[in-house]
Amino acid sequence: MHCAQYTAGRCRSCQWLDKPYPQQLADKQHHLESLLAGHAVTQWLAPVFGRESTFRNKAKMVVSGSVERPLLGMLHRDGTPVDLCACPLYPPSFEPVFTVLKTFIARAGLTPYNVARKRGELKFLLLTESTYNGELMLRFVLRSETKLAQLIAALPWLQQQLPQLAVISANIQPVHMAILEGEREIPLTEQQALPERFNQVPLYIRPQSFFQTNPPVAASLYATARQWVQEHEVHSMWDLFCGVGGFGLHCAGPETQLTGIEISAEAIACARQSAEQLGLKNVSFAALDSTRFATAEAQIPELVLVNPPRRGIGRELCDYLSQMAPKFILYSSCNAETMAKDISLLAGYHIERVQLFDMFPHTSHYEVLTLLALRR
């Protein structure tokens, strides 16, 4: 993959771009195998990968420059703006959208936030595309509500220029820190969920819910989880840290008792919408802390699926799972190092199979799916 900004030394987000892609995959696999070297693994499966470019469904653009000539991209470590509108990770459909958005910023008078001076209003633009129907979700991250009326007044022009814009919102982030978004989200369209579909499973993305950024590889990850679970004829399961419900909704059959837990109420609203559309009657989702929920339960399902943030599931939940001893633990991780630490705490389990999913080409990051089975 060629990137002009990388070649010019302006962007180093893809820190492995100089490394041939087969070597990237081999290095990631070696890293994963070294982390699990102290454990017997019954089956290692070949890494799953997708496209090397144009795979991202989401752009997080810092807005800088002037209101008349806004720049979208990132700030270099020396504080100068780097234009990322032509970033090769984005689908080709994004660049013309960015062109329209620059014009809109000027028309609406949305002054870009100046980090050095701590002045201005528009901090970020967050753009997400559905691979299911091409609809877009756009979030304006503002320092305050000062320019909100101007933004709303100018929206009809933007919607006319970009009819694929289905979900629009404003997020208020008043803090002068490198924080992407604030807690307050103001919906600006009636529709507030972007429909997505992986493997015939309807999923929904709301403004403040997490969703994978590499749809083709994410679809493979969910399909693999479903296959592994179905092979063991599981009738009851928990989906902890469930997000919008992607894993649980893939794995649950009509008779499966599924409980999905996620701290984000936005994500839970998406999961419930999907479950209703699928007609699943034995499924429930709740906006709770996953560890608090699990450790308060006296009954354990046959399988516990965990998909934690980078910190892993931690000692408390590992100790609880070891004590309650579900037959299977399906662990999906975006940080294999914390996953390996957690597995070391689950001494009553052996690793049945492991597979790497390269969700983040040209970086050292990857996802991994691991099936743990209770030792007989």
Curated annotation (Swiss-Prot):
[4Fe-4S] cluster binds at C3, C11, C14, C87. PROSITE patterns: SAM_MT_RNA_M5U, TRMA_1, TRMA_2. S-adenosyl-L-methionine binds at Q212, F241, E262, N307. The active site is at C334. Belongs to the class I-like SAM-binding methyltransferase superfamily. RNA M5U methyltransferase family. RlmC subfamily. HAMAP family: 23SrRNA_methyltr_RlmC (MF_01012). This is 23S rRNA (uracil(747)-C(5))-methyltransferase RlmC. It comes from Yersinia pseudotuberculosis serotype IB (strain PB1/+).
